[in-house]
């Protein structure tokens, strides 16, 4: 599988790291674009203006770990893409540019199924994809999720409550499977 990440997958951190941990086990290959990275920076800076240098380091590390994931979008697609929000065309263009099977986003309403299916792309929410991956390999997905939380807890010196984090990420059905 080839999956293009919308900004809402790269930010927040724990969700991004769950998907990247799963990707590192060859379940799929992730992609993102310059525009997605710039949106991530914009959103992050609005909330954490004093920590933008930390984000820049995080992005450098992300691109070093996944050098083939950061793509340039083919701007020729933009004029041919019709979505409810014109500002989301770059996301679909990114998915087209990397031949993605899946566009992973929280904003499904912005990406009509019919439009994407005609392009061979399936719009998916984080929960629907994680539930599918879990149904195919429950132990490995559960281990990826728990390992991600363990790493985050060590980095930040605190215990993130999986149930609360998943609730904030709209992963309510997955919570019952993991805990």
Predicted regions mapped to residue ranges:
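Metal-dependent nucleic-acid phosphoesterase active-site entry motif
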Residues: 1-17
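Acidic, metal-coordinating catalytic cores used for nucleic-acid/nucleotide bond scission
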Residues: 9-10, 79-87, 109-112
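PIN/NYN-family metal-dependent endoribonuclease catalytic core
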Residues: 13-47
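Conserved beta-strand segments of alpha/beta enzyme cores
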Residues: 29, 70, 120-122
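PIN-domain endoribonuclease scaffold, especially VapC-family toxins
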Residues: 34-74, 148-166, 170-173
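Active-site neighborhoods of divalent-metal-dependent phosphate/nucleic-acid chemistry enzymes
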Residues: 67-102, 136-138, 152, 156, ...
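Acidic, metal-binding active-site segment of PIN/NYN-like and related structure-specific nucleases
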Residues: 88-122
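Acidic, PIN/NYN-like endoribonuclease modules and their adjacent C-terminal/linker elements
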Residues: 108-179
């Amino acid at each position: 599988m080839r999956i293009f990440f919308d900004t809402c997958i790269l930010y927040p951190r724990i969700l991004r790291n769950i998907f990247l941990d799963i990707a590192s086990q060859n379940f799929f290959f992730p992609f993102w674009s310059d525009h997605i990275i710039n949106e991530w920076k914009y959103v992050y800076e609005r909330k954490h203006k004093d920590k933008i240098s930390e984000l820049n380091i995080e992005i450098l590390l992300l691109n070093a770990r996944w050098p083939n994931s950061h793509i340039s979008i083919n701007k020729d697609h933009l004029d041919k893409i019709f979505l409810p929000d014109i500002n989301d065309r770059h996301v679909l263009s990114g998915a087209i540019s990397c031949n993605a099977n899946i566009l992973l986003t929280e904003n499904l309403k912005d990406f009509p199924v019919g439009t994407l299916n005609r392009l061979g792309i399936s719009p998916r929410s984080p929960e629907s994809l994680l539930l599918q991956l879990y149904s195919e390999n429950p132990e490995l997905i559960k281990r990826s999720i728990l390992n991600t939380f363990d790493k985050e807890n060590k980095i930040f010196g605190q215990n993130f409550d999986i149930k609360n984090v998943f609730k904030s990420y709209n992963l309510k059905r997955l919570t019952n499977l993991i805990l």
